């Protein structure tokens, strides 16, 4: 089991609660088979908890109760599986086009006992529009916001929110994507911070509201 600092352990307990053992098991998958099968780089192991898993999981602060969530470009389950672990009330669909990643995700979902909560689609986001019914779309490290908006906003079918985990370039990306977002039906775009009460470095999230979805 990967060791955690006291601060990270406290944050993990706060975020995952009684599902912390499952989160720990997920991190072990990332640190072993996730590396062996090319889903995550070996240099990321020392910071799996704070830089990746907790960084993603705190986004649940921005998601309403009992929401249906589609995670685009799920890769190693970041942020989709982290959200599922942190919030048992959420219904999560992982959308990932690469077969080897979907195979790994399927194995991990089964091992964690999340099959009733998490569904996997092996397809591109554009192909999932007619397959997915969701109120929230999430993505992390997929592409720049202007391109990403075109892949994700259509999944909301005119109403909901898109949450993109971003870094310091968030404001600049919003400016570049403004025209595309408006054309796609985005009604408001904000830069929000999640996890400020539990993380030393909170997560920056770009939120795009679509239709009547206002918080």
Swiss-Prot record:
UniProt keyword list: Cytoplasm, Methyltransferase, rRNA processing, S-adenosyl-L-methionine, Transferase
Record's keyword annotation contains Cytoplasm: yes
Lineage: superkingdom: Bacteria
GO molecular-function terms, A-Z: rRNA (guanine-N7-)-methyltransferase activity
Pfam families: GidB
Subcellular location: Cytoplasm
E.C. no: 2.1.1.-
Residues that, per the record, bind S-adenosyl-L-methionine: 73, 78, 125-126, 140
Gene Ontology cellular-component annotations: cytosol
Coiled-coil annotated spans: none
Function (record text): Specifically methylates the N7 position of guanine in position 518 of 16S rRNA.
Similarity-based family: Belongs to the methyltransferase superfamily. RNA methyltransferase RsmG family.
Name listed for the protein in its UniProt record: Ribosomal RNA small subunit methyltransferase G
Species: Renibacterium salmoninarum (strain ATCC 33209 / DSM 20767 / JCM 11484 / NBRC 15589 / NCIMB 2235)
